[in-house]
Amino acid sequence: MISIIVPCYNEQESLPLFHKEATRVLQGIGQDYEILFINDGSKDNTLTEMRALAEQDPHVVYYSFSRNFGKEAAMYAGFCNARGDYVAVMDADLQ
């Protein structure tokens, strides 16, 4: 399994495109995968978007912090919860 960790802070507009592109690439690999979105205390509707994606796609898992703890804490939470044999961290804006 491949785990993709995506720390997110105010990324509601980026998440649908990220999900679409990441899913396209991951499906092409032919391995089981999961996408872990970590909401780092976003002030916009990032959490709502994560919930919607998780409802649509069983490969999506999300975790949410009560406040902003920083990217490193979000990455650590992702590493602690990733189930994959291979783990990568990506920015939600696809950079």
Language model feature labels by segment:
Residues 1-95:
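Structured catalytic core of nucleotide-sugar glycosyltransferases
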